[in-house]
Amino acid sequence: MHSSALLCCLVFLTGVRASPGQGTQSENSCTHFPGSLPHMLRELRVAFGRVKTFFQKKDQLDSMLLKESLLEDFKGYLGCQALSEMIQFYLEEVMPQAENHDPDIKEHVNSLGEKLKTFRLRLRRCHRFLPCENKSKAVAQVKNAVSKLQEKGVYKAMSEFDIFIDYIEAYMTMKTQN
């Protein structure tokens, strides 16, 4: 078992343990989740701010990668799946490649990835925010474009990470209002 998967399992199991006379920590954290959302998004933005200039300078493409269609998927019935797929895409495909582009930014990209993993873990604990199964065409288009662009695709995806955070915020705002 990979050490990161083992760590996630341990964190999950620790959060599930019931406190005497109370619901689980997971249930309690879910009631506070909407209130902690602005702080979590701010942490993502601050972490991205440490690498934003590097990747935006390297991004030589004029086209947008994260288009309005992705935001519409986030806001529509595919919102859950689009969010889940995009988080997975950044964690498994974009960030591992981005870490290898410059030793000076590796630590910062890694930190950004850890914050995104923590965010995903909290979303999964609170099932009403991430209960999904369907696939998003907009996410498939983003993945396809990055794959075709190769190294330039990594720069593009990382340079637009702030847009991704904005889309997360739009999705979470919609979910907390429902």
UniProtKB/Swiss-Prot annotation:
One of its GO terms (molecular function) is cytokine activity. One of its GO terms (biological process) is negative regulation of B cell proliferation. Residues 1-18 form the signal peptide. It comes from the Eukaryota. One of its GO terms (cellular component) is extracellular space. PROSITE patterns: INTERLEUKIN_10. Homodimer. Interacts with IL10RA and IL10RB. PANTHER family: INTERLEUKIN-10 (PTHR48482:SF5), INTERLEUKIN-19-RELATED (PTHR48482). This is Interleukin-10. It comes from Saimiri sciureus (Common squirrel monkey). The lineage of its organism: Eukaryota, Metazoa, Chordata, Craniata, Vertebrata.
